[in-house]
Amino acid sequence: MDLKTKSNIFQKIFAENWDEYFIFDTINSNNLTYKNFFELVINIKKNLEKRKVKEDDYLCLILNNSIELIALFFAAALLKITLICIDPSRGSDEILKMSTIQKSKFYLIDDKHQNFDIPETEIFSNIFQKNTNLNISISDLDLFNDLNYERLFTITFTSGSTGIPKGVMHNLNNYLKSSLLFNKRFNFSKNNIFYHNLPLSYIGGILNLLFLPFFSKSKIVLDEQFNISKVSNFWNNPVQYSVNTFWFTPTELSLLLKLDRGNLGIEYCKNKTIVGLVGTASLREEIKNNFENKYDLKLFESYCLSETFFVTTNYLNNDQANHTGPLLDDVKVSFTSDNEILLNTPSMFLGYLGLSNDEFFNNNGFYISGDLGKLNNNSLQILGRKKDLIIKGGMNISPKRIEDFIIGLKIFDEVAILGIEEYYMGEKIVCFYTSEESNLNNEIKLINNQIVQKLGLYFKIDEFIKLKILPKTPSGKINKPALKSKYNE
């Protein structure tokens, strides 16, 4: 896509749909047309300019989902600034570590009572206080002609096997290209209404549920982030707003199967044409089949990494069981001798903030994914992981980060953290430990309380197992495969 076409795509989408609805905000019962939304974007842009925010500045966002946060992404593109996106549900230590990787102009938070030990925090609601002298017209869309698609746009965070959060850098061009390539498989349009219930601090919330719908000229129903308390009334807002396009996570699917005891979702799916997309983690075939049978809703699994964006997807009339689908156009894949997936995509990330790219790419410029897989009839099958990560509820979690934290508490003699397959969350976190103490019930409660406070709820240990000794390799390292086998006996 040439520069002129890129520059016009924002302007064209807004202009062609100026008086049509774009976002239905279920959080605040506020429905915005493209015109209303553009007014909000310009309002936030002007308020940031009043605070001396200028080109190439960084803003750190520690924010929950809101329609104003969505507008901030568009305002940031116009201002040519970079957004550092951090999940506010992470623990205080994790947030502090991420927020100090790069100096920011402001650190935006939702509530003055949030205590992240970060200076220069600003309450986000101050940024979108309405300017009374705004006179927006369709001609103001010319502002989009000056967008810079190549400069650094977002930094999101992923957990590496070392336990140190890595800042994944992307430009606006990557969001555009990946969205358009993915949409070639589905042909989304203004008839599609996406249900947005993933956090806007991760790629799933930004790419899958913001820019993919926008560049597809689709509508968005914005809701709070999904959690287990939302299961019983999961279908209420989708039914009310006639949602017909979902991005499910495997955790959502398994929890709906277990806890959704009503007929609202079943009847809705049976009587409406719905696209069910699945991402963020591998989907077990058992869960897929059970969900499709219960709701009469076809699920299309895809493969997408924070670093590469969309790689593959199943789609209508091209859906192979136990596979994540054919490669998208212009995506290249290779494999090492032990089946590790190597990737080259048109929307490859710019690198990790502050780190050299050398250890993450091979000599041919392919990204070393850490996942294992193979191609069958041009469809990618994921076989497992090479890197030491736990995926719990779609969240990448470093076992080493938890091990180091527990060791620092000096309660156990030895510690090993493993991810064990679990039906609802994908994997559960199991702590194997040794100790000469016989009763550590209070200490175990203390460990989990500290983990939730400092690292975040997703890091909470699901099961503690005491052993006399932890098995070791000949080199003296803890033998995690042996531990996993012992657990499964």
Q: Locations of the language-model features?
A:
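Conserved AMP-binding A3 loop
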Residues: T33-K35, F153-L180, F309
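AMP-binding/adenylate-forming catalytic core of the ANL superfamily
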Residues: T345, L372-F459, G476
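Conserved pre-ATP/AMP-binding loop-to-beta segment of ANL
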Residues: L3, W18-D19, L134-F157, I164, ...
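Conserved structural elements of the adenylate-forming
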Residues: F37-I44, Y149, V168-S189, N197, ...
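Gly/Ser/Thr-rich phosphate-binding loop
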Residues: N244-F248, L257-D319, K332
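Conserved ATP/PPi-binding loop(s) of AMP-dependent carboxylate-activating enzymes
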Residues: P326-D330, T336-N364, M395-I397
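Conserved AMP-binding/adenylation subdomain of ANL enzymes
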Residues: L176-I193, I203-T245, L259
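Conserved AMP-binding/adenylate-forming
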Residues: K46-R90, P199, N396, S435
